[in-house]
């Protein structure tokens, strides 16, 4: 089989399964409204949970940062790309979340890959929730360590896997809020079992940070858990992009020596770090509380209105509200129907989610209004 035949076969298989991904160029895609092909849609696909991507203070901070520092960092943080603004953001994140240190990364994907690649050796074992994000599971699969997966949120299964002999160290990996189901991990129970077996815990809280807990401190703070490794990302609650790893001073020093994704990547622009500092300030103050409270009200309104629909509604109290329809083609048809009625919704299909669980991944944000939720419910009930 030639290269071209191999590529064609893979694409044909995706097409046949109604699983071929495609991108839609949008003129605006992160706020309450999505604009594509000169048409405006209510946007139920954005991860901008607090509606901060268009916040005037955050925009102004980025503009001022660009004027002062330029539009790029100029290099890796190990060379010339680590600015006083990066340092200030790391210190503010560490203080906010109760850690000694924070290290910035270009993306959550890079942060997860970097930590696992740097920390794990052949004699070690990773025990991961089987619904963990692709960045975590891919890094675990590519690492020299053994990978074992426990049934989603099943602490008893996790305990059994941890109890089996391991010559090295054990790292338990999970998410705070799961990206495709919107449910939360029982972090306190997971940490207890992990500590009983002398393991370390790594939590990716991409979808909880900024959105839940006191001052938006996220899933771990809410459940009174402090994992050895906490990954937070800035493309969701913060409304920007990038990520950070929160850890001890010793682990931070170790990652600065051995995390290749950090060492060999150009660091985020200082202007972006400036915008993230402004976003963090909004998240921590009363305005952040008001946005989180509004989001909770919107979620409650939506869940109350979909109980009688012929779909499986995931057990989620988060901004992620999946309607599981099962069949790929049906999910695509429903997403298209919603778009025709002015609601932009994304159909998520395998391999992103398990086979037979294709879904509409609906996301609600503080930028929405109650009438937006009512309109979505109207269309879902076939009255659009």
From Swiss-Prot:
Residues that coordinate or bind pyridoxal 5'-phosphate: 108-109, 179, 207, 233
EC identifiers of the protein: 2.3.1.47
CDD domains associated with the record: KBL_like
Keywords carried by this UniProt record: Biotin biosynthesis, Pyridoxal phosphate, Transferase
Record PTM N6-(pyridoxal phosphate)lysine, positions in chain: 236
A GO MF term: 8-amino-7-oxononanoate synthase activity
Cofactor annotation: pyridoxal 5'-phosphate
Gene Ontology BP annotations: biotin biosynthetic process
Protein name: 8-amino-7-oxononanoate synthase
Family: Belongs to the class-II pyridoxal-phosphate-dependent aminotransferase family. BioF subfamily.
Enzyme class, UniProt record, top EC level: transferase
Residues annotated for substrate binding in this entry: 21, 133, 352
Pathway: Cofactor biosynthesis; biotin biosynthesis
InterPro entries in the record: Aminotrans_II_pyridoxalP_BS (IPR001917), Aminotransferase_I/II_large (IPR004839), AON_synthase_class-II (IPR050087), AONS_Archaea/Proteobacteria (IPR004723), AONS_Proteobacteria (IPR022834), PyrdxlP-dep_Trfase (IPR015424), PyrdxlP-dep_Trfase_major (IPR015421), PyrdxlP-dep_Trfase_small (IPR015422)
UniProt source species: Shigella sonnei (strain Ss046)
Reactions it catalyzes: 6-carboxyhexanoyl-[ACP] + L-alanine + H(+) = (8S)-8-amino-7-oxononanoate + holo-[ACP] + CO2
Subunit structure: Homodimer.
Described purpose of this protein according to its UniProt entry: Catalyzes the decarboxylative condensation of pimeloyl-[acyl-carrier protein] and L-alanine to produce 8-amino-7-oxononanoate (AON), [acyl-carrier protein], and carbon dioxide.
NCBIfam families linked to this entry: bioF (TIGR00858)
PANTHER family in UniProt: 8-AMINO-7-OXONONANOATE SYNTHASE, CLASS II AMINOTRANSFERASE/8-AMINO-7-OXONONANOATE SYNTHASE
Taxonomic classification: Bacteria, Pseudomonadati, Pseudomonadota, Gammaproteobacteria, Enterobacterales
UniProt gene name: bioF
Gene3D superfamilies assigned to the protein according to its UniProt record, in alphabetical order: Aspartate Aminotransferase, domain 1, Type I PLP-dependent aspartate aminotransferase-like (Major domain)
């Amino acid at each position: 089989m030639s290269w071209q035949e191999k590529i064609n076969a893979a694409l044909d298989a995706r097409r046949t399964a109604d699983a071929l991904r495609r991108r839609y160029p949008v003129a605006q895609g992160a706020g309450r409204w999505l604009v594509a092909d000169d048409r405006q849609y209510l946007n139920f696909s954005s991860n901008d949970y607090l509606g901060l991507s268009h916040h005037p203070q955050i925009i102004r901070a980025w503009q001022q940062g660009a004027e002062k520092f330029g539009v790029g960092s100029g290099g890796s943080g190990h060379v010339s790309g680590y600015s006083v603004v990066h340092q200030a953001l790391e210190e503010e994140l560490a203080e906010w979340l109760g850690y000694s240190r924070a290290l910035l990364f270009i993306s959550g994907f890079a942060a997860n890959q970097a930590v696992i690649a740097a920390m794990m050796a052949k004699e070690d074992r990773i025990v991961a929730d089987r619904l963990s994000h692709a960045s975590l599971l891919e890094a675990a699969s590519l690492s020299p360590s053994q990978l074992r997966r426990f049934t989603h949120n099943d602490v008893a299964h996790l305990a059994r896997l941890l109890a089996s002999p391991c010559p090295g160290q054990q790292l338990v990996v999970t998410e705070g809020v799961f990206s495709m189901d919107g449910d939360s991990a029982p972090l306190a129970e997971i940490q207890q079992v992990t500590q009983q077996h002398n393991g370390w815990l790594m939590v990716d809280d991409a979808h909880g940070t900024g959105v839940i807990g006191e001052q938006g401190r996220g899933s771990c703070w809410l459940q009174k858990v402090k994992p050895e490794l906490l990954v937070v990302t800035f493309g969701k609650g913060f409304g920007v992009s990038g990520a950070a790893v929160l850890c001890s001073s010793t682990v931070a020093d170790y990652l600065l020596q051995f995390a290749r994704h950090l060492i060999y990547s150009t660091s985020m622009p200082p202007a972006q770090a400036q915008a993230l500092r402004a976003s963090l300030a909004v998240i921590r103050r009363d305005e952040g509380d008001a946005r989180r409270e509004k989001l909770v009200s919107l979620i409650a309104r939506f869940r109350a209105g979909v109980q009688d629909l012929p779909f499986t509604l995931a057990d989620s109290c988060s901004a992620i509200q999946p309607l599981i329809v099962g069949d790929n083609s049906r999910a695509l048809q429903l997403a298209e129907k919603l778009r025709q009625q002015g609601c932009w919704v994304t159909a998520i299909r395998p391999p992103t989610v398990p086979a037979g669980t294709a879904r509409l991944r609906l996301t609600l944000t503080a930028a929405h209004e109650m009438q937006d939720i009512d309109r979505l419910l109207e269309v879902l009930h076939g009255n659009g």
